[in-house]
Amino acid sequence: MDPHGWPGVPYLEGSTEHRVPTAVDRGRRGPAGKEGDGFLNPAMSGNRTRSVLMLKHLANTSLRGVQKIQTIDSMCATGIRTRRWLNELPGDIASRLRVKMCDMNENALEWARSNLRNDPLGHNVSVIRGDARKELLSQGWHWIDIDPYGSPMPFLDLAMQATARRSVVSISATDTAALSGSSRGPLKRRYGAQVRLDPLKHDSGLRVLLGAAAVAAARHDRVITPLLSVWDSHHLRVTVLVDRSKRGANAYQDSIGWRVANPSQRDVELAIGAGLLPPHDAGSTPMHVMLPLSASPSDRSNVSGPLWTGIMGDAELMRSLSGEAASLICGSGDSALDTNEQKYARQSVRNIEKEANAILSLIHISEPTRRRTI
């Protein structure tokens, strides 16, 4: 049975026409409210576009041998992310997906079911009302998408525990004020970290989130490899490859440490000795350095951490997230709408391809009129 108000109004994202209860401002930025029937936040469209492109790339690389890609779209709301996977991925990849969509809002799920009804691959999707934390543990997953309202910390351990032998986990965090150091109490309580309020605060926030993912993975004999780390408007998002490896889990602390601003010469020497700074930087005074966890700086006023000190992305995957690739997934048949969607799609991957070989692999996607900063 269709939900009250069906068919509602059309909303186009990528090349997928989705039905929602009320009109959505396609250009809206920033966070949305936690409550509401038929929830859909257009500010997360870039997040979903990158999700489509990453799944396309990884289905042919890291997950190439997986015939049925067991996927969970937790906190799915009306299901726009899953529908974009089904409609915008090449058919040979989309047909491999076995998706479970779950949410606590029954009305949103009714809209999701009705939206799926005419999708050719809708039969490969199950729509479940329930707590994502319970559904995560219902089976092993090759692809896990965590997109909560606020902090992802309540879901991290369960997600890592639920991964298959090799899996991809995408983690969104909208508690940006905490992760970027503005709200120190929540940052300390949730992540056990501190972040210095400086131009690198969002980089540090991404690294704190990666560090939390690495620690959670290690608790369950897993090891992470960062694939993409993005600050986009009001949220942070990291995507990691997760492999089962007791040896890798034992060594997780090798990639956890501290960021020190205005370092002393001793800090520089420690960073070089730990392999976190090139030897040719000896004698210089960089703006900041990474130090290993064992360094435990005594002066915490210029320190961020504990956080991830390794690279934050995979160059091959990042090169696949090009403006051209993003534009190609936008083709509804309406040239005017397609042009607009192509603009949004290209914006969602702006700078990623050309930063593929950057040593920090940090991507900052901000307002269209602002430039990326590292």
Task: Outline where the language-model segments fall.
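S-adenosyl-L-methionine
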Residues: 2-65, 69, 81-88, 102, 106-141
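Residue-level detector of conserved catalytic or cofactor/ligand-binding positions
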Residues: 363-374
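A short glycine-rich, Lys/Arg-flanked "PGG" loop and its adjoining helix->strand segment in the class I
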Residues: 156-167
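Short beta-strand element of Class I
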Residues: 96-100
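Conserved beta-strand signature within the Rossmann-like core of class I S-adenosyl-L-methionine
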Residues: 166-174
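Class I SAM-dependent methyltransferase "Motif I" SAM/SAH-binding loop
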Residues: 73-80
